[in-house]
């Protein structure tokens, strides 16, 4: 999302369309087609506990001209990439497929039928084999266009540790009340509560109101997840930050934003963790 006003204008224009016209714009995958796999075979079976480097980035569908080069550069030096607004048009499909080190798994939120049936969703990439992979489709839908948001999650083994790392990438439902946002967040919280081990939950939470920020932070506190601190540069809507990284069961070594990267409207965020 570039700015809120553009998205609101889109919703307004959609509201004027007949329902049959809107139905032709979006399609939805069968359950066995939600996950789309790209990239290469993984080269490692476990994360190095001395350094676990994770990228969080809403890629704005790869629309900006420098996205491809930025994506290749950013993913070269991280263990895990937690991605939002993955958009498997010809360009992004090629870039994902040709990635030299990462295997990428995308959970499809919806398919843009009007643009040649292009799947869009959230994705996790890594050169480490995933021990588990799953997704959640939001029960709440965006108003008017009636599209859901998919959350992707994956687990990774850690060398010398019995417990695995759970990673979650979210692109939260947007033009809804804080109550409907909480429906989506609480659904994902079930995955967190069921996991015994360290957790990283990151993404675009679409917390563009104070109330949404409050309910998100209240839930993270209940889950005993800590917010990673970042300097200036994160995406804001109506003056409120919407991109976050939360974690538990890990030691934080570093966290920073890369404001100079122009590959998307959101700025990439990088965190590095370790386990003693």
What are these regions (language model features)?
Residues 57-60, 83-86, 107-111, 127-128, ...:
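Active-site-proximal beta-strand/loop segments in catalytic clefts of secreted hydrolases
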Residues 7-15:
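Bacterial N-terminal signal peptides
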Residues 22-42, 155, 192-197, 206-276:
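Metal-dependent phosphoester-hydrolase catalytic domains
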Residues 1-5:
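Positively charged n-region of N-terminal signal peptides that target proteins for export
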Residues 52-59, 71-95, 166-170, 184, ...:
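Active-site beta-strand/loop signature of hydrolases that rely on acidic residues for catalysis
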């Amino acid at each position: 999302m570039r700015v809120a006003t553009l998205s609101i204008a889109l919703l307004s224009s959609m509201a004027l369309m007949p329902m049959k016209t809107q139905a032709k714009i979006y399609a939805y995958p069968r359950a066995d087609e939600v996950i789309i796999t790209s990239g290469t075979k993984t080269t490692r079976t476990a994360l190095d506990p001395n350094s676990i480097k994770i990228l969080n980035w809403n890629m704005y569908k790869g629309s900006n001209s420098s996205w491809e080069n930025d994506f290749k550069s950013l993913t070269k030096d991280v263990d895990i990439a937690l991605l939002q607004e993955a958009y498997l048009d010809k360009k992004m499909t090629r870039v994902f497929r040709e990635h030299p080190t990462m295997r990428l798994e995308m959970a499809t939120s919806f398919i843009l039928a009007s643009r040649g049936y292009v799947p869009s969703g959230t994705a996790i990439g890594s050169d480490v084999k995933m021990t588990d992979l799953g997704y959640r489709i939001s029960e709440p839908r965006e108003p008017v266009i009636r599209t859901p948001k998919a959350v992707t999650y994956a687990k990774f083994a850690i060398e010398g540790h019995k417990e695995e790392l759970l990673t979650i990438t979210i692109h939260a439902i947007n033009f809804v009340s804080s109550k409907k946002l909480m429906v989506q967040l609480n659904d994902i919280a079930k995955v967190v509560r069921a996991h015994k081990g360290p957790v990283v939950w990151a993404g675009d939470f679409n917390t563009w109101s104070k109330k949404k920020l409050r309910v998100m932070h209240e839930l993270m506190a209940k889950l005993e997840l800590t917010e990673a601190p970042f300097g200036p540069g994160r995406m804001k809507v109506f003056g409120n930050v919407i991109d976050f990284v939360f974690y538990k069961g890990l030691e934080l070594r570093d966290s920073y934003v890369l404001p100079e990267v122009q590959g998307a409207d959101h700025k990439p965020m990088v965190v590095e963790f370790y386990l003693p």
